[in-house]
Amino acid sequence: MENLFCPICGSRRVSPAANGIYMCASCDNAFSFTKEVTYAKTTADIYKASVECVLEINTIAGENESSGTGIVISPHGYVLTNAHITGEAMAGVGNMKNYCDVIIAGRRPREILFMAELIYSDKAADLALLYCAEAEEMPALKISYSTVKTGDKICVIGNGKGEGLGIVDGIVSDTCREIGGRKLMMISAPVTTGYSGGPVLSADGEFIGMVTGGRDGETAMNYAIPSVTIRKFLASAEKKAGIRL
């Protein structure tokens, strides 16, 4: 039992239920290590199970302040977000170079502000990896290996307009849309400024992508980086930055 962990949130607070089914005391999800378990989840269920893995991110570049979202993807304090969120703020000079503010769990008005350091970035993929010591031992979202289909229901958690974490839902409008040389997933969820860097979650609560942007005035035409691209980025980060996720 000491080697078991929840495949959804990463917690080790796992206990057997019945017939090969296990329960996680941290996220209240049921799962099996030997067979697929299917059950309906509400948007509220998905939010409850995943929100502790999502952070608010605030960056300042000169007089410009911007907000976004980050995802805890490792219990070692590593946070995934968009490169366009960290770009200008983390290209500064002096003691603040390569740092930005993060709000743990975003429980406004009880937010806790910490600093995060830029570890690795890929501007072409619009992905950045941060390190925040205070995020160590936090539950982490595990990247899904499931096949995503056009029409699948999804939810997105994000820091909309910089006003705190919230959740919106929609569907996968297209699993592969080429935009600016990148292969992205198109989603109908009405994400706004600040949702960039937020996780796209399947109807089962699996982490299948991350918001990267949308079209001005087209709230039902937004784009997400698919999980396969995220996995490649993280593998590159481990190799080139010499870290272990």
Task: Please provide the spans of the model-predicted regions.
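Catalytic nucleophile loop of clan PA
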Residues: 71-72, 190-211, 223
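A conserved glycine-rich beta-strand in the N-terminal activation segment of trypsin-fold
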Residues: 41-43, 54-78, 82-83, 112-115, ...
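C-terminal cap/linker of serine protease catalytic domains
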Residues: 39-47, 92-104, 114-118, 138, ...
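Short cysteine-rich clusters marking metal-coordination/redox-active sites
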Residues: 6-9, 24-27
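Short functional micro-motifs and their immediate structural scaffolds
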Residues: 14-15, 32
